[in-house]
Each structure stands twice: as C-alpha cells, then as structure tokens.
C-alpha cells in the first residue's frame, strides 16, 4: 500500500436499498493531519470501510460513518466500533465548515480510530476539538441526500446507507 500524496483522493460510493445514491470525492489535508490521512487511506485500501454505513445523520450538522459495528443488523451497536486502536489527535486551524471531513471520537481527545464525519453545515464549535483532515471536492449533493433521510431517535437512518471507499492518486 502506497503512502498518501497531495494527489491522493478518496471516493465514497453511497448506496441504499441496492440503488446507488452517488459518489462523494474527498481530498486530504496532509499538511495539518498527516497521521489521520495515513490512517484513513490505509483503512480504505484494506477494504475496512466497505459495507459499513452512515449510521448517524443530523440535519444542519453532519453525516457520520466508518464504524465496523454498522455491518451488524442490530442498530444498538452502531457507533461503538473501531479498528482496534486509537490515534493521537491532530487538532488544527482548518475550520469545520460545510464539506469538511473530520474524525469522530469519544470524550477522550486521542480516541479516534475509524469513524469519520462530513459536515453538511458550518460547525465552528468543533474547531480545535476534532481533527479536520480533508474536504469534499465533489458530491455534497450526495451528503445532502443522506442527511435528509428519515431517521430514528438515535439519528440512525431508517434505511441502511452503505458505503464503499476507494483510494486513487
């Protein structure tokens, strides 16, 4: 597996009920979050994200995915999984604006692993508290479709929203 470069892109192919909703293409912030970029691209190249879902969607805020537990039909476990390790925070000056890719974590700053979120609106209250490590270059319309889906009381979409992530140079 190759090291990510300035030209590295990720494509998240999103589907629901067997129909493709579209693609979200990401570029990375190597300069401010190299560890997070390397972690995300490594997991994607290993196929870790394939078959996981966007398990948390909050209109006016973000869509969250990357949890291996989201492959389990039991939604109670969604949002609790990771890759089996944690990575050190790389808080930086990139603002959490619409389209920014950032790592989800627990209350512990150094607890990120595989779960990530894409802001669908500006969320400056997250600045310097969560690691922004990329941004959407195309496909925000797909993120908007996902965040607009009907959801349960835990902000889990009622229809499964599955992803496949590929890395290109």
Regions found by a protein language model. Give the residues of each.
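Cyclophilin-like peptidyl-prolyl cis-trans isomerases
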Residues: 1-169
């Amino acid at each position: 597996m190759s090291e990510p470069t300035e030209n590295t892109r990720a494509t998240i192919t999103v589907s629901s009920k067997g129909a493709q909703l579209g693609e979200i293409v990401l570029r990375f912030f190597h300069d401010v979050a190299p560890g997070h970029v390397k972690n995300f691209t490594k997991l994607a190249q290993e196929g870790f994200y394939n078959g996981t879902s966007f398990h948390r969607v909050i209109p006016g805020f973000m869509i969250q995915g990357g949890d291996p537990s989201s492959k389990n039909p039991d939604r109670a476990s969604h949002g609790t999984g990771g890759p089996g390790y944690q990575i050190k925070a790389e808080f930086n000056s990139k603002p959490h604006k619409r389209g920014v890719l950032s790592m989800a974590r627990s209350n512990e700053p150094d607890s990120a692993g595989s779960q990530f979120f894409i802001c669908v609106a500006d969320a400056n209250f997250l600045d310097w508290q969560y690691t922004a490590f990329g941004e959407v270059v195309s496909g925000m319309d797909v993120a908007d479709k996902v965040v607009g889906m009907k959801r349960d009381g835990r902000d889990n979409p009622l229809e499964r929203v599955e992803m496949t992530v590929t890395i290109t140079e």
